[in-house]
Protein backbone atom coordinates (compact mmCIF):
# COMPACT_ATOMS: atom_id res chain seq x y z
CA UNK A 1 0.00 0.00 0.00
CA UNK A 2 1.27 3.47 -0.89
CA UNK A 3 0.37 7.04 -0.06
CA UNK A 4 0.78 8.86 -3.38
CA UNK A 5 0.74 12.63 -3.42
CA UNK A 6 1.97 15.66 -5.29
CA UNK A 7 1.31 19.35 -5.65
CA UNK A 8 1.45 22.03 -8.25
CA UNK A 9 4.87 23.36 -9.13
CA UNK A 10 5.67 26.37 -6.90
CA UNK A 11 2.39 25.76 -5.07
CA UNK A 12 0.42 26.62 -8.23
CA UNK A 13 -3.20 25.45 -8.42
CA UNK A 14 -3.60 22.27 -10.41
CA UNK A 15 -7.40 22.44 -10.33
CA UNK A 16 -8.85 25.77 -11.43
CA UNK A 17 -12.38 24.83 -12.42
CA UNK A 18 -14.83 22.12 -11.43
CA UNK A 19 -14.36 20.40 -14.78
CA UNK A 20 -10.64 19.98 -13.97
CA UNK A 21 -11.48 17.77 -10.99
CA UNK A 22 -13.82 15.68 -13.14
CA UNK A 23 -11.23 15.29 -15.87
CA UNK A 24 -8.47 14.33 -13.42
CA UNK A 25 -10.70 11.64 -11.91
CA UNK A 26 -11.61 10.34 -15.37
CA UNK A 27 -7.91 10.00 -16.18
CA UNK A 28 -7.38 8.27 -12.84
CA UNK A 29 -10.13 5.79 -13.75
CA UNK A 30 -8.52 5.18 -17.14
CA UNK A 31 -4.91 4.80 -16.06
CA UNK A 32 -4.84 3.80 -12.39
CA UNK A 33 -7.98 1.78 -11.59
CA UNK A 34 -6.82 -1.06 -13.88
CA UNK A 35 -3.58 -1.48 -11.89
CA UNK A 36 -4.38 -0.33 -8.33
CA UNK A 37 -7.02 -0.57 -5.63
CA UNK A 38 -7.86 2.85 -4.22
CA UNK A 39 -8.70 3.14 -0.53
CA UNK A 40 -8.92 6.93 -0.21
CA UNK A 41 -8.30 10.10 -2.19
CA UNK A 42 -8.58 13.85 -1.87
CA UNK A 43 -8.10 16.50 -4.55
CA UNK A 44 -7.39 20.02 -3.30
CA UNK A 45 -6.83 23.00 -5.54
CA UNK A 46 -3.04 22.81 -5.39
CA UNK A 47 -2.33 19.19 -4.40
CA UNK A 48 -3.76 15.68 -4.12
CA UNK A 49 -3.49 12.50 -2.06
CA UNK A 50 -4.25 8.86 -2.91
CA UNK A 51 -3.97 5.74 -0.79
CA UNK A 52 -3.55 2.76 -3.11
CA UNK A 53 -2.52 -0.86 -3.28
CA UNK A 54 -0.80 -1.89 -6.48
CA UNK A 55 -2.50 -5.02 -7.78
CA UNK A 56 -0.66 -8.22 -8.58
CA UNK A 57 -0.11 -8.58 -12.33
CA UNK A 58 -2.76 -11.33 -12.60
CA UNK A 59 -5.33 -8.87 -11.13
CA UNK A 60 -4.70 -6.16 -13.72
CA UNK A 61 -7.65 -5.33 -15.89
CA UNK A 62 -6.50 -6.57 -19.32
CA UNK A 63 -4.25 -4.02 -20.97
CA UNK A 64 -1.47 -5.90 -22.70
CA UNK A 65 -0.99 -7.86 -19.46
CA UNK A 66 1.59 -10.12 -21.07
CA UNK A 67 3.88 -7.12 -21.53
CA UNK A 68 3.60 -6.04 -17.89
CA UNK A 69 5.36 -9.13 -16.62
CA UNK A 70 8.52 -8.00 -18.41
CA UNK A 71 8.10 -4.30 -17.60
CA UNK A 72 8.91 -3.43 -13.99
CA UNK A 73 8.07 0.25 -14.61
CA UNK A 74 4.61 -0.46 -16.03
CA UNK A 75 2.65 0.87 -13.04
CA UNK A 76 4.80 3.98 -12.63
CA UNK A 77 4.27 4.72 -16.30
CA UNK A 78 0.50 4.46 -15.86
CA UNK A 79 0.69 7.19 -13.21
CA UNK A 80 3.05 9.23 -15.38
CA UNK A 81 0.71 8.98 -18.38
CA UNK A 82 -2.15 10.18 -16.21
CA UNK A 83 -0.20 13.17 -14.86
CA UNK A 84 1.20 14.08 -18.28
CA UNK A 85 -2.22 13.88 -19.95
CA UNK A 86 -3.70 16.08 -17.26
CA UNK A 87 -0.86 18.64 -17.43
CA UNK A 88 -1.15 18.86 -21.21
CA UNK A 89 -4.89 19.50 -20.99
CA UNK A 90 -4.42 22.23 -18.36
CA UNK A 91 -1.64 23.83 -20.40
CA UNK A 92 -3.90 23.91 -23.46
CA UNK A 93 -6.99 25.11 -21.58
CA UNK A 94 -5.19 27.91 -19.74
CA UNK A 95 -2.63 28.87 -22.36
CA UNK A 96 0.32 27.91 -20.20
CA UNK A 97 3.52 25.98 -20.81
CA UNK A 98 5.86 23.86 -18.75
CA UNK A 99 5.39 21.48 -15.88
CA UNK A 100 2.28 21.51 -13.76
CA UNK A 101 3.35 19.13 -10.99
CA UNK A 102 6.40 18.88 -8.81
CA UNK A 103 8.25 15.96 -10.27
CA UNK A 104 8.30 13.10 -9.72
CA UNK A 105 5.12 12.30 -7.82
CA UNK A 106 5.84 11.29 -4.26
CA UNK A 107 5.00 7.97 -2.64
CA UNK A 108 5.39 6.55 0.83
CA UNK A 109 5.04 2.86 1.55
CA UNK A 110 2.40 2.10 4.17
CA UNK A 111 3.31 -1.10 5.99
CA UNK A 112 1.60 -0.90 9.39
CA UNK A 113 -2.16 -1.24 9.88
CA UNK A 114 -2.18 1.73 12.27
CA UNK A 115 -0.41 3.89 9.68
CA UNK A 116 -2.91 2.77 7.02
CA UNK A 117 -5.84 3.79 9.24
CA UNK A 118 -4.17 7.10 10.09
CA UNK A 119 -3.61 7.83 6.39
CA UNK A 120 -7.31 7.36 5.60
CA UNK A 121 -8.12 9.93 8.28
CA UNK A 122 -5.33 12.26 7.16
CA UNK A 123 -6.47 12.19 3.54
CA UNK A 124 -10.13 12.78 4.34
CA UNK A 125 -9.35 15.55 6.85
CA UNK A 126 -6.98 17.38 4.49
CA UNK A 127 -9.63 19.90 3.32
CA UNK A 128 -10.33 20.72 6.98
CA UNK A 129 -6.61 21.07 7.76
CA UNK A 130 -6.25 23.56 4.89
CA UNK A 131 -9.41 25.42 5.96
CA UNK A 132 -11.43 24.76 2.80
CA UNK A 133 -14.27 23.38 4.92
CA UNK A 134 -15.12 22.89 8.58
CA UNK A 135 -15.84 19.16 8.28
CA UNK A 136 -14.98 16.48 5.72
CA UNK A 137 -18.68 15.97 4.91
CA UNK A 138 -18.71 19.39 3.23
CA UNK A 139 -15.91 18.62 0.76
CA UNK A 140 -16.94 16.92 -2.48
CA UNK A 141 -13.54 16.20 -4.06
CA UNK A 142 -12.57 13.35 -1.76
CA UNK A 143 -13.57 9.75 -1.24
CA UNK A 144 -15.04 10.56 2.18
CA UNK A 145 -18.69 10.07 1.15
CA UNK A 146 -17.95 6.91 -0.86
CA UNK A 147 -15.91 5.56 2.04
CA UNK A 148 -18.88 5.82 4.41
CA UNK A 149 -21.54 4.78 1.91
CA UNK A 150 -22.88 1.30 1.23
CA UNK A 151 -23.43 2.16 -2.44
CA UNK A 152 -21.34 0.45 -5.12
CA UNK A 153 -18.11 2.30 -5.80
CA UNK A 154 -14.69 1.73 -7.32
CA UNK A 155 -13.23 2.61 -3.93
CA UNK A 156 -11.87 -0.38 -2.00
CA UNK A 157 -13.54 -0.26 1.42
CA UNK A 158 -12.16 -3.58 2.70
Annotate the PLM regions.
Residues 1-45, 53-158:
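Short Pro-Cys-Gly-centered "Cys-loop" motif that presents a nucleophilic cysteine in a tight turn
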